[in-house]
């Protein structure tokens, strides 16, 4: 249990720093995992929020408890594009309100949510970083945010790869 607390603290510390750099309203780490199997042994893959930070005064609430074991088949297009492009942007508009990806928009004041893929050292997708932004979308701004979030992803890989993290801690 102690290692779990240390892992979460290491993740949260890195997330807060990135959140402050890009002025995000919320930052969260989501990991893909295996869910329950069907009677024929087919795995049901899911995604869960393992860590989040909400900016003080943002007017949005934490979502970690409700963003637990969500079936990824609800987000086939989103996950496919995230894997292909390493990035996916969800705009808060009428079109999004008719899709399952709206769960990544916490409040009306959020203009967009940017997802950045997380990969392990073997280039297998682990999950994604989600940042919710209250400021209006601009391509240049989102590209700058992506650069910072890509750096965060690099920092998180050894922490999320538990065996690598324990090796680093013992050095």
Regions found by a protein language model. Give the residues of each.
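Short hydrophobic/aromatic beta-strand element in the GNAT-like acyltransferase core
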Residues: 102, 115, 128
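Well-ordered, non-membrane alpha-helical segments in soluble/globular domains
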Residues: 7-14, 73-76, 145-153
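Juxtadomain coupling helices with adjacent low-complexity linkers
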Residues: 125-171
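Short, glycine/acidic-rich beta->alpha junctions
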Residues: 10, 108-110
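Short acidic, S/G/P-rich loop/turn micro-motifs used as interaction or catalytic elements
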Residues: 36, 95-97, 134-139
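Intrinsically disordered, low-complexity terminal regulatory regions
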Residues: 1-58, 162-171
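Regulatory sensory and allosteric helical modules in signal-transduction proteins
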Residues: 48-108
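A short, aliphatic-rich beta-strand micro-motif
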Residues: 111-120
């Amino acid at each position: 249990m102690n290692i779990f607390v240390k892992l979460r603290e290491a993740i949260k510390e890195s997330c807060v720093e990135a959140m402050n750099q890009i002025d995000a309203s919320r930052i969260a780490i989501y990991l893909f995992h295996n869910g329950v199997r069907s009677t024929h042994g087919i795995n049901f893959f899911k995604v869960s929020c393992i860590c989040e930070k909400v900016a003080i005064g943002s007017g949005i609430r934490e979502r970690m408890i409700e963003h637990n074991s969500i079936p990824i088949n609800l987000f086939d297009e989103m996950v496919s594009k995230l894997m292909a492009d390493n990035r996916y942007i969800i705009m808060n508009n009428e079109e999004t309100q008719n899709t399952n990806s709206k769960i990544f928009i916490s409040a009306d004041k959020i203009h967009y949510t940017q997802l950045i893929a997380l990969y392990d050292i073997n280039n297998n997708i682990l999950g994604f970083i989600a940042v919710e932004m209250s400021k209006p979308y601009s391509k240049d701004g989102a590209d700058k945010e992506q650069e910072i979030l890509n750096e965060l992803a690099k920092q998180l890989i050894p922490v999320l790869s538990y065996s690598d993290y324990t090796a680093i801690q013992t050095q």
